[in-house]
Amino acid sequence: MCGIVGYVGMRSAQQVLLDGLEKLEYRGYDSAGVALTQRDGIRVVKSKGRLSALRSKLEELALPQSGCGIGHTRWATHGEPSDVNSHPHSTPRVSIVHNGIIENYGALKERLIAKGYTFASETDTEVLVKLIDSCYHGEPLQALQAALAKVRGSYALAVLFKDYPDTIFAVKRESPLIVGWGEGENFVASDIPALLKYTRRYSVLEEGDMAVCTAQGIRFYNEFGEAVEREKLTADWDMEAAEKGGYPHFMLKEINEEPAAITATVSPRVENGLPELRIPELTDEMLRSIGTVHLVGCGTAMHAGMVGKTAIEALARVPAQVDIASEFRYRDPILKPEDLVIIISQSGETSDTLAALKLAKSRGVPVLAIVNVVGSSIARAADYVMYTYAGPEIAVASTKAYMVQLCVLYLFALRLAYARGQLTEEKTKYYTAQLLHASEVIKPRLADCEQIKYLASRYVNTQSCFFIGRGFDYALSLEGSLKLKEISYVHSDAYAAGELKHGTISLITDGVPVIALATQKNVYEKTISNAKETRSRGARVLLFTTKDAEVPEGVATEVIRLDEYDDILMPLQLIVPLQLFAYYMAVLRGCDVDKPRNLAKSVTVE
């Protein structure tokens, strides 16, 4: 998730911007840059890599002091990390920094090329700044309104115009942006930590707002161009709390960012109601020729692959296999030229997963990577890439990255099914619309925190528990169990519910918790029967099911009911309460939620 800072006032804008960007480093970034107003125009300085590289460049340049500028730390979404792809992006008249994704940037770029504009980078932001430039005729607000009316997507923008050297224009749509109030100076930022060294007074831009910031004051306009007032707030957070957005832990913050991550990942890949992979080389003709899909990952990514396997086989009727990367690379897998290997990794640097990718390529099998980090080793090595736009994930236990890995796998499964004629256009559009709606479907689950917290308090002293489920629910059992044990240190195992009688049931004794997932209608009665078996042996059964499901008396100790949703997409809703349950168990047990013992965010060794 990119970081934005803007400053106008009597101080050195360069220093204020660097201070602010440093406080946003926790968001993750691969490059940084600033734009500073000068007597002869706007000077842009940017650099790939750490903020220290940008500092060094600025020290070498020794620019005249400027009292107005904008800065940016970039998390790549379009174009690999590089100086040319870094922000700010500029024309001789306009400079901008941007957080968000412009969904229709390709079509806009073609129109701008037809008007004579040229492009140096691969980014959607360069398209945006040149679109604004094309609409600029001396009045910045009119230019911004005209340009943004043509844009589809999300953005938080800070904009400089050469003709207005003492003014920052800020615009917000579906990406967070605030302004800070000072004395004879004012600020723009994507998050509060960037401001706290200089001010604690701020206002939050509402959807569609534009703010005009000068040293003397800030004016607000709504999406219709009407002058409005925005409430002045006072931040009473310390720096650590500010970085977490007011949440006690990054993990809880990231769980609550899942709706936005779903929208950012899915929306740009839907056109005319149909899923689009946005990979020109991976044509429908190639999809029709795929033999077997091999899904490979480690830990949570492998669990996402299990959901993907079930979706691919259910929707596209294509054989699919799931492998743990460390097993795949050493078991001499049978791979055929017509197969496709899908590599799943949040970081794009996972050692075993990268080795599995290299093995597949050495056998002449095409590789599609699903990763969250643009320009990562896996992204560079794969034949095709689909990025998950989760933004940086700070907590070691993956939550929002897993969520959008599922979304990308569903998009792939739907396109594969459509290309192969297994789904009609009508049915494909139905599933795609349901997937787009997922961000709204999960919001009530995020609001159920108190119920989940209460249940966690009832199970907090548990030493061992079991998860059971069938089909998609089994895949979710594995992930729910992993989340619980990795952050709360409660021993937990997950089993296919039908396997209980094949040994596992011998471990069920009085008071042992069994978390039963029963959201799939075609196997609901069988899963309930399995849960009842454990209950009859003294287990405490926590049942997750849907609102319309009939739960026989005596089956469950507690029941969590989910909204009705398509069975195939139900994992998107079910995972949220499972993540929250693990989170609150860890909190109540006094565990280090964001940094569990012995674990690393990216495993780059075997």
Which functions belong to the PLM regions below?
Residues M1-K244, P248-H249, E257-T292, Y330, ...:
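Conserved short alpha-helical segments that host acidic/polar catalytic motifs at enzyme active sites
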Residues D163-Y164, S175-L177, E183-G184, Y202-G246, ...:
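A SIS-like phosphosugar-recognition module
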